[in-house]
């Protein structure tokens, strides 16, 4: 049987160095090394602002439910949703960071006191029917609008016509909390022909599990989502659907294959088609450091407009790559040329254009202070 504190203890110990980082900032000039500072950023740069926090760091709005903010997903017609790994909740915000009254509970797996959501996706179709109970206890079913993966090995759906207060487990690979449970660190929604498919990154077993629109397992060709040129000990960590393909980030496993090992150069990013066929080794080593979040920047996002942005959980930096070649273009930096660092960086998505959530603003969630805290922030391109 496992518990969240046991699984994350090593990660928190590794992240204890985060006291040297601000929750969202570049290093102070007196502490910055030559490698951290780059000239030519005084007119075209990026600016970060912490919109929400659990109170552990200054922010525009407080929210005690926001601890270890992980996945980020936008309702195309509404608020952003953030998966709160540390509280087993999902919380909603507008573009200023103002919390929405709706707070959704994510069910715990056996051995957990609360759910441990990681990846989250929005689903707007009629599939992914979720079975649950109404607030009065009556059974009811309906299509999930948001779907969550958890470190406990479960996938849950939230169907608003069933129960707005909680999601319901639709895939259970927790194995009763045993040692062989899946540990889903990321989730993506993609397609195979005319169908929708869920892709869950199982870090523990070094694989990507795939489910159809009925939450049933899908068998892909042998060797799907594998890269024989990866070093041993690397496993799927984050996953993001972009332009019909799946970007999969790989992080180095600890001895228990439960958590990532941070370190400069500890990371790879591959691109696969919906059937799991390797298309491209997109990025490797270099500045990668336990990479998790992936987003494609709009053309209006400053000097890195149109680039693929990859966020490092390991050191909190955000790095840009050419969308076709994967050539490293540089790191997001502030007006002093210092790398922007988001302590405990996880999910990153551009806004939906509604509720003060611009399509050229990058919204990010994080678990600062060794994943004990939580933040939701925005990073904008600035020209002057």
What are these regions (language model features)?
Residues 1-13:
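N-terminal secretory signal peptides that target proteins for export/translocation
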Residues 12-19, 279:
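Intrinsically disordered, low-complexity segments enriched in polar/charged small residues
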Residues 16-29:
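Bacterial N-terminal signal peptides
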Residues 8, 28, 36-37:
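Intrinsically disordered, low-complexity, hydrophilic segments
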